[in-house]
Regions:
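N-terminal low-complexity segments that are often proline-rich with Ser/Thr-Pro
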Residues: 1-2
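Active-site HxH/HxHxD metal-binding segment of metal-dependent hydrolases
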Residues: 5, 9-71, 156-160
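Metallo-beta-lactamase
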Residues: 46-47, 75-164
Length: 164
């Protein structure tokens, strides 16, 4: 896929609520998340009503799968399926730049919520251990909310991961 697409690796209203409107207006394809989150994308309108926002349900033009790559110019994101916050959550890892687009999987000092529909705490911890804690300490984590962090800091100080 390319930068001429609208990429959504997250599926809740706070991340994907305007996706359909933007894609239509800008004439872009929508890529992602993983198909396991289709139920959330088909409930965006209802999610929006709960928060007084307008949102349109949509089906992506292409779903993201574990092992896919997304290219932006000369930057390549390696897609990893990381269920837990949501069953179809994916992250993007740029190995060359040592950067991660983590969405709502890992935060500075915390982890994503698992109390939302089909969230699963153990799946989230397993995803983090398998796909993030295996990376070098200097990998920068761009979180879906809040300040950036890095793998080394989270490995040493994140209360959810210290004994994981």
């Amino acid at each position: 896929s390319s930068a001429a697409s609208d990429v959504y690796k997250r599926q809740h209203i706070d991340h994907a609520g305007a996706a359909k409107e933007l894609a239509t207006k800008l004439k872009l394809d929508i890529i992602g998340p993983h198909i396991d989150d289709n139920f959330l994308l088909q409930a965006l309108e209802i999610q929006g009503q709960m928060y007084g926002m307008k949102a349109q349900n949509f089906t992506p033009d292409k779903w993201l799968n574990h092992g896919d790559t997304i290219t932006f110019g000369n930057q390549i994101l390696d897609i990893k399926h990381c269920p837990g916050h949501a069953p179809g959550h994916v992250i993007g890892i740029n190995h060359k730049a040592k950067k991660i687009i983590a969405g709502d999987v890992l935060f500075n000092g915390s982890i994503g919520r698992t109390d939302l529909p089909q969230g699963n705490y153990q799946d989230l911890i397993d995803s983090i251990k398998k796909h993030l804690l295996t990376l070098e300490d200097e990998f920068i984590v761009h979180c879906g909310h809040g300040p950036d962090t890095n793998i080394g800091t989270e490995r040493k100080t994140n209360p959810f991961l210290i004994n994981a």
